[in-house]
Curated annotation (Swiss-Prot):
Coiled coil: none annotated. Residues 16-109 form the GST N-terminal domain. It comes from Aspergillus flavus (strain ATCC 200026 / FGSC A1120 / IAM 13836 / NRRL 3357 / JCM 12722 / SRRC 167). Disruption phenotype: Does not alter the production of ustiloxin B. This is Glutathione S-transferase-like protein ustS. Keywords: Transferase. One of its GO terms (molecular function) is transferase activity.
Length: 276
């Protein structure tokens, strides 16, 4: 059976009440949505409440994370014809999925300069951490507002345990406090503007980190930008206005892959004893 004839890959996303293509909101999950759309891989999709993620992946015999607070997370895919790490053909975690899809569907390449592009993606992910942590303070309290009741209870409880205080207390109550976080986050993001701009006039063309060639490193940046686009348009516009429009150019060149959708398909979740 050829890749065009086989059953489509299935993509598992996190449920939200956001409208239209904004329903998909998690930056980690959106990385794989971008990969699927960029490569033109046919896929079906289903959306799942937070407390259903562990029983879903357990039922598919996906090996749990060996480290971290959560043993099971989205994104995940199910594609028995290519995934051999579990009996069901399912796997989770954005970077392993991205690498698997790039090997299975090599054109167009997700790492256009090979190992150098892979190293760039790892570097972007590491450099993103300070800005992402600051953004958590601003946007996590808004994220809980778009979840279903069961998802909200789970999200608030687990994130309160992680941060050591209620999510409602993460975002400063004063404009000065918010401005301090925003300015700090923007300072953390200046390095990405420099990388997108290149060494000087005429040295680089194209809106992507590697010029005219998009890659997974770009998707890490774009999905981070999408978080503010989903939850705080004023913040998103402020980020877009940074530098000489480098973020805006990257966004407009990439949004088609961010917003693309698969075919909706119901995927029942068995009721199992679970761990987070």
């Amino acid at each position: 059976m050829t890749k065009t004839e086989e059953s489509p890959l299935h993509f598992f996303d996190i449920f939200s009440t956001l409208p239209g293509t904004s329903k998909s909101w998690s930056s980690n999950v959106l990385k794989i949505r971008m990969v699927l759309n960029y490569k033109g891989i046919p896929y079906t999709q289903s959306f799942h409440s937070y407390p259903d993620i562990a029983p879903l992946l357990q039922s598919l015999s996906v090996p749990p994370h060996k480290q971290g607070r959560f043993k099971y997370t989205l994104p995940a895919i199910c594609h028995p014809s290519s995934v051999k790490s579990s009996p069901s053909g399912a796997m989770m975690d954005s970077l392993p999925i991205a690498c698997h899809l790039d090997e299975t569907y090599p054109d167009p390449p997700l790492f256009p300069s090979g190992e150098a592009s892979y190293a760039l993606a790892l570097a972007i992910g590491k450099l993103m951490v300070p800005a992402a942590l600051k953004t958590c303070d601003l946007l996590l309290p808004k994220a809980e507002e778009v979840l279903d009741d069961r998802g909200k209870e789970y999200f608030v409880r687990t994130r309160t345990e992680i941060f050591g205080k209620p999510l409602s207390e993460l975002r400063p109550k004063t404009e000065e406090g918010v401005r301090a976080i925003v300015d700090g986050m923007k300072a953390d993001m200046e390095v990405f503007i420099s990388m997108l701009r290149g060494r000087g006039e005429g040295k680089k063309s194209g809106p992507f980190l590697e010029g005219e060639k998009p890659g997974y490193a770009d998707f890490i940046l774009v999905t981070f930008l999408s978080w503010s686009h989903r939850f705080d348009m004023e913040l998103w516009r402020e980020i877009m206005d940074m530098g000489n429009g480098e973020f805006r150019a990257l966004w407009h060149a990439s949004v088609q892959w961010l917003e693309g959708q698969g075919e909706e398909k119901e995927w029942a979740v068995p009721q199992l004893s679970t761990v987070d």
